[in-house]
Each structure stands twice: as structure tokens, then as C-alpha cells.
From Swiss-Prot:
Coiled coil: none annotated. One of its GO terms (molecular function) is phosphoglycerate kinase activity. The lineage of its organism: Eukaryota, Viridiplantae, Streptophyta, Embryophyta, Tracheophyta. This is Phosphoglycerate kinase. The keyword Cell membrane does not apply. It comes from Pseudotsuga menziesii (Douglas-fir). Belongs to the phosphoglycerate kinase family. Monomer. It is an enzyme of class 2 (transferase). Keywords: ATP-binding, Kinase, Nucleotide-binding, Transferase.
Length: 33
């Protein structure tokens, strides 16, 4: 079973990746226009 600290760390990593993907998507949209 995962420790709470490990789960929190993974969730934080996922959040960072999602924000980077969102910024990348916005960037590609502005380029496509």
C-alpha cells in the first residue's frame, strides 16, 4: 500500500505535468491561428 507522502508526491508530479501540457496546448493553439 502506498504511503500518503508517496501518493501526495505523485499527485504533485501529475499536477505539474498537466499544467505543462495545458501551457503547451495553449501555445500550439496560438501558433495555429
Amino acid at each position: 500500500f502506498l504511503k500518503p507522502s508517496v501518493a501526495g508526491f505523485l499527485l504533485q508530479k501529475i499536477g505539474v505535468i498537466e499544467s505543462l501540457l495545458e501551457k503547451f496546448a495553449v501555445g500550439t493553439e496560438s501558433i495555429a491561428k
